[in-house]
């Protein structure tokens, strides 16, 4: 059986990237929470 995590930069960015986060209200709240916490990386 193959492992479930098969890394791909494109897929990673398309599902968890900054632009995707900004599209929905929930995603924007994620970015806001990470900004408030002082995260160095807001999104992938």
From Swiss-Prot:
Biological processes, Gene Ontology terms: translation
Signal peptide: none
GO molecular function, one term: structural constituent of ribosome
InterPro entries: Ribosomal_bL34 (IPR000271), Ribosomal_bL34_CS (IPR020939)
Alphabetical UniProt keywords: Ribonucleoprotein, Ribosomal protein
GO cellular component: ribonucleoprotein complex; ribosome
Domain of life of the organism encoding this protein: Bacteria
Matches recorded under Gene3D superfamilies: 1.10.287.3980
NCBIfam families: rpmH_bact (TIGR01030)
Similarity annotation: Belongs to the bacterial ribosomal protein bL34 family.
Classification via PANTHER family: LARGE RIBOSOMAL SUBUNIT PROTEIN BL34M, MITOCHONDRIAL RIBOSOMAL PROTEIN 34 FAMILY MEMBER
Protein name: Large ribosomal subunit protein bL34
Source organism of this protein record: Leptothrix cholodnii (strain ATCC 51168 / LMG 8142 / SP-6)
Organism taxonomic ancestry: Bacteria, Pseudomonadati, Pseudomonadota, Betaproteobacteria, Burkholderiales
């Amino acid at each position: 059986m193959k492992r479930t995590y098969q890394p791909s930069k494109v897929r990673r960015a398309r599902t968890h990237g900054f632009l995707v986060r900004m599209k929905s209200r929930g995603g924007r709240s994620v970015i806001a929470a990470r900004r408030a916490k002082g995260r160095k990386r807001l999104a992938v």
